A protein has these predicted regions:
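Boundary at the C-terminal end of the N-terminal hydrophobic targeting segment
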Residues: 24-28
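Short, acidic loop-to-helix structural element flanking the phosphoryl-transfer center
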Residues: 90-91, 108-144, 155
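Active-site neighborhood of HAD-like aspartate-dependent phosphohydrolases
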Residues: 30-71
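An amphipathic alpha-helix signature
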Residues: 51, 66, 70, 90, ...
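N-terminal secretory signal peptides and thylakoid transit peptides that target proteins
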Residues: 1-16
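Glycine-rich phosphate-binding loop signature in dinucleotide/nucleotide-binding domains
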Residues: 31, 139-141, 193-196
Length: 254
């Protein structure tokens, strides 16, 4: 759902007014323990155009190339964090793509590489995101990305989706030079919001991020859009659902 600017401005203004009233009432009544939501990127960002672009450019090979690319994206991030050799997610994503092309024996020209990387700057939000974010704001909840994405990558999604004004400052892992699930990354939410861990919901997309957030101490909601299996890491999310409407219900339950 891409809101036109007039409709969005009206909804956002209403949400801020309602937030001021409702947040005070909720705290006074002791109804909800939550005061903010920190989002991983992908509960908000729809990554499917990347897969579509891969198949368009490399028919019959797109799925294999994409699988290797995604795996190496996160493995490279984790390895760089463990080794103290941080590079931002844009660089990690490009390096992972180059490896994936070699591993799948696909000849990737510089122009093709650039076109695939550009897809990340063209991504938009999932259709259920805009109304859900307005509902969360109206319930008095503060919102921010806490993501491995760079700030320019997050800014692009917000522009592409017409979501200006809903999120606070981006908490990109670039700020601490450590990718999730490093505790330094999750700590950004506590520091930025100025709240206790138990007052901040972490909205995760991947099972490993559920585990990382739970280990850190956040109440964690798994936005399991792909119906993925839970990881065997000894933790269970506090809530789970297929979309942001489920997160809204969890965050605003009395």
């Amino acid at each position: 759902m891409l809101l036109d600017r007039r409709t969005f401005t009206t909804m956002a203004a209403a949400s801020v007014t309602a937030a001021t009233v409702l947040s005070g009432r909720s705290r006074a009544a002791g109804r909800s323990p939550f005061r903010a939501v920190a989002f991983d990127g992908f509960p908000v960002i729809d990554p499917r155009p990347v897969s579509a672009r891969l198949e368009e450019m490399f028919p019959g090979m797109g799925a294999e190339l994409g699988a290797v690319w995604r795996t190496r994206q996160f493995e490279y991030g984790w390895l760089r964090t463990l080794g103290g050799k941080y590079a931002d997610f844009w660089r990690v994503t490009e390096d992972a793509l180059l490896f994936a092309a070699k591993a799948t024996k696909i000849s990737l020209s510089p122009e093709q590489r650039d076109r695939l990387m550009q897809t990340y700057l063209e991504l938009k939000a999932w259709p259920d995101v805009a109304p859900a974010l307005v509902q969360l704001r109206a319930a008095g909840l503060r919102l921010a990305f806490l993501s491995n994405f760079t700030a320019p990558m997050l800014d692009a999604v917000i522009r592409n989706s017409g979501l200006e004004g809903l999120f606070e400052e981006h908490l990109s892992t670039d700020k601490v030079a450590a990718f999730k699930p490093d505790a330094r990354a999750y700590q950004m939410g506590v520091d930025a919001f100025g709240l206790k861990k138990e007052e901040i919901i972490f909205a995760a997309f991947a099972g490993w991020d559920v585990a990382g957030a739970k280990w850190f101490g956040y109440p964690t909601f798994w936005v399991n859009r792909t119906n993925a299996s839970a990881e065997e890491l000894g933790v269970t999310p506090d809530g789970a659902g297929a979309g942001l409407h489920d997160l809204v219900a969890f965050a605003t339950a009395r």
